[in-house]
Design a protein with these regions (language model features):
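N-terminal small/polar loop signature for handling phosphorylated ligands or for N-terminal nucleophile
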Residues: 11, 18, 68, 72-158
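An N-terminal, well-structured beta->alpha segment
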Residues: 1-98, 102
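A short, gly/pro- and small-residue-rich
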Residues: 158-164
Length: 164
């Protein structure tokens, strides 16, 4: 167990959330700098806005690519989108919804505008695709649903994450 488990955050752990969010909108990644490119790891794209590694331009590009991918695969069902409490999750959520709406993608969000746990998004997709029915879960065909979860998971508070 970590020696600080269960202890209050220390001053050096705290972030300036306004600085983090402003950097999300204000800093523009340079495609010539490898650390500023979109990079998908084992669980989506993660990075920090202050490092120009998770910014609005990244989310616009990733979401536009998802729209193109959905079209190429014939995925035309609801896209479920959720977010967690990290500081960059809400701005990335808003950006993604704007891109999806502009592309005409039917999108489902929490009715209260609240945070949505990853398992809730996964469960919604499975139900929409036939889980619990006699036919079972579909993986192709008209009306197929999918989703986006905006969370860097266990990463530090200054980070953002985007998973499809």
């Amino acid at each position: 167990m970590h020696p600080r488990a269960g202890q209050p955050a220390q001053p050096e752990d705290l972030i300036d959330i306004d600085e983090v969010i402003n950097a999300y909108y204000d800093l523009v990644p340079d495609p010539a700098v490898p650390e500023q490119k979109v990079v998908f790891g084992t669980s989506g794209h993660r990075g920090a806005s202050l490092d120009t590694a998770f910014n609005e331009a990244h989310i616009v590009a990733i979401t536009a690519a998802i729209v193109e991918y959905r079209r190429s695969q014939g995925t035309d069902g609801v896209l479920y989108i959720g977010r967690d409490t990290h500081g960059l999750s809400e701005p990335a959520w808003r950006t993604a919804i704007e891109v999806l709406a502009g592309a005409g993608v039917t999108t489902a969000v929490d009715a209260r505008g609240a945070y949505t746990p990853t398992p809730a998004v996964s469960h919604s997709i499975l139900l929409a695709n036939g889980a619990g029915t006699e036919a079972g879960v579909r993986t192709t065909g008209p009306g197929l649903a999918d989703g986006i979860v905006i969370t860097p998971s266990h990463n530090p508070p200054r980070d953002g994450g985007f998973k499809y």
